[in-house]
Amino acid sequence: MYLMYVDESGDCGIVNSPTRYFVLTGLVMHELRWQVYLNTLLDFRRAVKAKYGLRLRDELHAAAFLSHPGELLNRIPRHDRLAIIREFADTLATMADLSLINIVVDKQGKAADYDVFGLAWRALIQRFENTLSWCNFPGPANPDERGMLFPDHTDDKKLTLLLRQMRHYNPVPNQAAYGTGYRNLVIGKIIEDPNFRDSGHSYFVQAVDLVAFLLYQHLVPSAYMRKKSGQNYFLRLDPILCKVASSQDPRGIVRL
């Protein structure tokens, strides 16, 4: 069984949206690595507590943690908060059997009725399904694996209905070599409805939130991140990027 934790950065709006991009990221691991990697994250958080004073129960929500930490976390200087983010990325990059699937929607030029949320999630679910089918995830593998979704809370109802629909009707355009038209490639490897998680209670959701944030900052860095070269932090995750997710991008980013 492979588990995929999911979070996003940016917003889904098209009209009058303050953001150009919407990023959706999935962090995938095999069930046999779950406890090992949870222990790795706990060790990281204990080290951060000793070094910077960030308590284990404090949520590390990357965007807010860096720019709007609130009264409790504001006691940690901003440059230290950035260092924590960098060290978090470096810790994830050591987890060789993690795999990161990244979807980027460039909303510029899209029609007002373009379904950013639905199409981004459809692309992520399809890549998860495909990679399961081809046994392309690193780490332990059984002959016939399945997968489950563990997203941060989002439009829970819409996502649940989308996944259920894709199990019965999932039109995918034919590759150019096979001519025009579609094939109905229904989802068969992903079981159950999405299991939604509260990021404040899940280190894995906080980890995938960090990845989505760093990819967004790689695309359009804030003034502070640009000043500190933080736009390059996403590249520190290169060892665990799922590069088979897209042959059109050297880092496997699926661009819509």
Positions of PLM-derived features:
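Phosphate-ester processing/binding pockets and catalytic centers
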Residues: 1-256
